[in-house]
Amino acid sequence: MNPARRCSALLSQLCVTSRGGSTARRPLSPGPVSALGGTRCCRSGVGGGGAGVKETCPQPRPSGASTTGTAPVCPMGRSSSRLFGTFAQSLNRAPLAQPAPYPEENPDQDLAQTDPDQLLRECEEALQRRPARPHRHLVYPSGTASRRHKHNPAIRIMQWNILAQALGEGKDGFIRCPMDALNWQERKYLIMEEILTYRPDILCLQEVDHYYDTFQPVLASLGYHGSFLAKPWSPCLDVERNNGPDGCALFYRRSRFSLQATAYLRLSAMMLPTNQVAIVQTLICRETGQRLCVAVTHLKARSGWERMRSAQGADLLRSLRGITSQRSSGQTEAAPGAVPLVVCGDFNAEPSEDVYRRFSSSALGLNSAYKLLSADGQTEPAYTTWKIRPSGESCSTLDYIWYTQGALSVDCLLDIPTEEQIGPDRLPSYHYPSDHLSLLCDISFRDEPHRLM
């Protein structure tokens, strides 16, 4: 049997259970059938909620889920149109039913821990008949050498739109990518191999539609705490064979951080709710005791929606100003933006768009990390996504890691693969699992930040 078509014993064990009800899915061979977790409730805050926390967002449960063979199906009617993808439908449809809340996180601590080296070897074994992923290098801005801080170690952050499985197979139309290359039983290994190769301390993902059956159990066993927020009306649910809604996920390594507060945001535009979301968490670094606010988001896609993306970005920035101004215990007051901030996301916006200018000129003092790869330190990469669809070839810079430049410094970044490495068929492909490239940087707290925390 082709090893790329079997699930390793370890990975299949990790994908067996999660909290809540179960839904049948394609059986793994060998190994037990995985169970999808039930829906989760969005909470307005954890431990230290407060300013900047938006309305709670219901987590949709696939209603009337049925099975075709053994793959989950969430029927959404006979329509083959672009359901849930427009502003008007977000406004006109009634909100999804509010699920019963779950107890606060986290049962992850009870899971047996997995050796990441062993899991990486199993991924490599399962992928041995596929071409190798593009080899990428860590680049140190301005020729600075690698720095190691004994009492202030670097924090590795990864940003990645991993491509929702339902969209890759059913809607996105990657005409130069063979359907076999998008097979989830193979593609999940490529995604996990990328994560395990770089082992981020903080992982921000978009288009996650296999959170409960894959990413949450696997990453929890590797020592991560995970949070997930689905889009209110995910386009994945318009695909006949789907695994539930897609959304944003945020993971952090429990050995490095403790959680102070969480905000689940449904972004608004012109005071009206939209279909895009964000997760914002305030973390406490165990080594230094310093706080770090991390946000993950995914703004409205497609050309023609620039004004909505700008409004969504403005709404997110307002929330972040409130959240990063929250006082910690013992403080009498806090200045706006007092907590250092990292914002990761697929903004679906080129640097020429207004939403990019909003972030770069924000009072929060944000800078885009990947500008530091350029010779002048002011130019974004030529692309973070490169795909071919029926409408043509698209090579764009849409993904960003923003950071508070007065309080944080970027030590190194993962370079961008060349056109030759990506290949003539572009992304996704047999050797890369998504149409978006992962972004990764090491950051550290400045010894003397411009603003006290």
Segments predicted by a language model, with ranges:
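Structured beta-strand-rich core segments of catalytic domains in phosphoester-bond hydrolases
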Residues: 104-154, 202-301, 305, 394, ...
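A conditional alpha-helix N-cap/helix-loop micro-motif detector
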Residues: 184-188, 309
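Acidic/histidine-rich helix-loop elements
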Residues: 162-185, 236, 270-271, 303
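His/acidic metal-ligating clusters that form di-metal
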Residues: 277-284, 291-295, 307-345, 349
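Residue-level marker for buried hydrophobic side chains located in beta-strands
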Residues: 157-158, 343
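Metal-dependent phosphoester-hydrolase catalytic domains
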Residues: 2-144, 201, 211, 321-342, ...
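Proline-aspartate-enriched helix->loop->beta-strand connector
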Residues: 188, 193-208
